[in-house]
């Protein structure tokens, strides 16, 4: 079975992320969403909270699995027999960065390719960073995030 992985910090998962997951789930029989533990990043939600928010957000997708990881992505890819890495690219800046990561991951995994998904137009401006900034300044993020994330933010 072809399995792909969509790694990210997802702090929090946005509707842009969810759109990419849903589109991937239509194309591939198995999509793994790997939530990264990034000690160098100051996250709003803990790893456990982020994993649970992603799980709740993709509960309607039967071929999507969610887990947290702290290891090198290349090692996770080998452990799960992954065929390709899914990455979202909004801008040319994203593309340049992702191109470098794709080359590195291809080297470290002995050939696993990265597949770049442009965002749906309505989500092209959305990022976790923007969502956090709006939230921290008291703005309404209801249209930008899945319902479980909005509820978790309201409860904070």
Swiss-Prot record:
Pathway given in the UniProt record? Cofactor biosynthesis; coenzyme A biosynthesis; CoA from (R)-pantothenate: step 4/5
GO annotation, cellular component aspect:
cytoplasm
Q: Where does ATP bind?
A: 9-10, 17, 88-90, 98, 123-129
CDD domains according to UniProt: PPAT
**Cofactors (names):** Mg(2+)
User: Which GO MF term does the entry hold, naming one?
Assistant: ATP binding
A Pfam family this chain is assigned to: CTP_transf_like
Does the UniProt entry include the keyword ATP-binding?
A: yes
Binding locations of substrate = 9, 41, 73, 87
Q: Where in the cell is it found?
A: Cytoplasm
Fetch the InterPro entries from UniProt.
Answer: Cyt_trans-like, PPAT, Rossmann-like_a/b/a_fold
Q: What class of enzyme is it?
A: transferase
Q: What is its EC number?
A: 2.7.7.3
Alphabetical keyword list: ATP-binding, Coenzyme A biosynthesis, Cytoplasm, Magnesium, Nucleotide-binding, Nucleotidyltransferase, Transferase
Chemical reaction(s) catalysed: (R)-4'-phosphopantetheine + ATP + H(+) = 3'-dephospho-CoA + diphosphate
Give the site residues for Transition state stabilizer.
17
Biological process according to GO: coenzyme A biosynthetic process
Q: Which Gene3D superfamilies match?
A: HUPs
According to the record, the segments passing through the membrane are: none
Family, according to the entry, reads as follows:
Belongs to the bacterial CoaD family.
How is the subunit organization of this protein annotated in UniProt?
Answer: Homohexamer.
Functionally, this protein is described as follows: Reversibly transfers an adenylyl group from ATP to 4'-phosphopantetheine, yielding dephospho-CoA (dPCoA) and pyrophosphate.
The identity of this protein, by name, is: Phosphopantetheine adenylyltransferase
